[in-house]
Swiss-Prot record:
GO MF terms held by the record: 3'-5'-RNA exonuclease activity; tRNA binding; tRNA nucleotidyltransferase activity
GO biological process, one term: rRNA catabolic process
Domain of life: Bacteria
HAMAP family referenced in this protein's UniProt entry, alphabetically: RNase_PH
Assembly mode: Homohexameric ring arranged as a trimer of dimers.
UniProt catalytic activity: tRNA(n+1) + phosphate = tRNA(n) + a ribonucleoside 5'-diphosphate
Pfam assignment, any one: RNase_PH_C
Species of provenance: Xylella fastidiosa (strain 9a5c)
Protein name: Ribonuclease PH
Length: 241
């Protein structure tokens, strides 16, 4: 099927992805991650405490918060703080980020401390949650390295890498890493979180206009595997700098 993507990319191509470490000066880990025009700041903050349900259990915790700046989108959105509550979408995404990052941490090795990943969207052009997960992992690694440099860890609690990417069916064609024009006009939209051993951590898939078939699902998962493999390479390159 000869279908052109609005960006001109091939069906299996990511947008340009960049990860800039040490983006802020206070947090133990911080990055600016960009997927094309989507920009997210991810910071990792370490606190010597755990939630009540983990007190005196010898385990740590990894959690996340997510938010979008008022003009990160085409029109201004009111700050959630001004409304007095978080939107359902915000809660869903920050829980997803926290779940994803906990899978790559040995919480016993972390000890009784909490690492909070704050993911703030500066500019949204599709795929903010997948960009946040991919960037937050790098911030998490830097926070762990900081603890190691301080002599506060006996061993690294990291047990793998995590990345996420969107896939979808756009005008009948399976595509990788949807931007906003594709995301707003696709037949199927799916977010895939994976680890660097090829394991699937989470799938969020929705048929927007018409149902998708098993064969199409398999093609989307294959695209997601390809995309996350490229993202793991980008993460490793960023962490080596």
């Amino acid at each position: 099927m000869n279908v052109s993507r609005p960006s001109g990319r091939q069906a299996d191509a990511l947008r340009p992805v960049r990860i800039e470490r040490a983006f802020t000066c206070h947090a133990e880990g911080s990055v600016l991650v960009s997927f094309g025009n989507t920009l997210v700041v991810c910071t990792a903050s370490v606190e010597a405490k755990v939630p009540v349900f983990l007190r005196n259990k010898g385990e740590g915790w990894v959690t996340a918060e997510y938010g979008m700046l008022p003009r990160s989108t085409h029109t201004r959105s009111e700050r959630e703080a001004a409304r007095g509550k978080q939107a359902g979408r915000t809660l869903e995404i920050q829980r997803l980020i926290g779940r994803a990052l906990r899978t790559c941490v040995d919480r016993t090795a972390l000890g009784e401390r909490t690492i909070t990943l704050d993911c703030d969207v500066l500019q949204a052009d599709g795929g903010t949650r997948t960009a946040a997960i991919t960037g937050a992992y790098v911030a998490l690694v830097d926070a762990v390295r900081c603890l190691e440099q301080r002599g506060q860890l006996k061993k690294s609690p990291l047990i793998g890498a995590v990345a996420a990417v969107s896939v979808g069916i756009y005008r009948g064609m399976p595509v990788l890493d949807l931007d906003y024009p594709e995301d707003s006009d696709c037949d199927t939209d799916m977010n895939v979180v994976m680890n660097d051993e090829g394991g699937v951590i989470e799938l969020q898939g929705t048929a927007e206009q018409q149902a998708f078939r098993r064969g199409e699902l398999d093609m989307l998962l294959a695209l997601a595997e390809r995309g996350t493999a490229m993202l793991f390479d980008i993460q490793r390159e960023a962490l080596a700098r």
